[in-house]
């Protein structure tokens, strides 16, 4: 009985003096791993326009059906996304949208802070994704 008590206390004391594993979150932030998939971002070309040509491949390949694109054309008859919305409440962050894009217009970032107060704030539109 006493031997088991001493063993238990020795294990407790050993762990008591070790460095803590948990981070104090808002003050200390963990750096994501190299292959981490966070919130999506739309890329711009050198002229400042979105690289996206509204081909709908990302929306087609998305298993959660979280992407909605409505194509439009500019005065030079180039297609661009008139509406580009990602519902992060449905997104499973699989990265298939990034792999399917032929123009490398959509990228997964290292941003993982997604806390919002309203469900509508989980809908990221084109302007938000281009930041």
Language model features: what each stretch is:
Residues 1-79, 85, 89-90, 96-99, ...:
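Non-ligating segments of multi-cofactor redox enzymes
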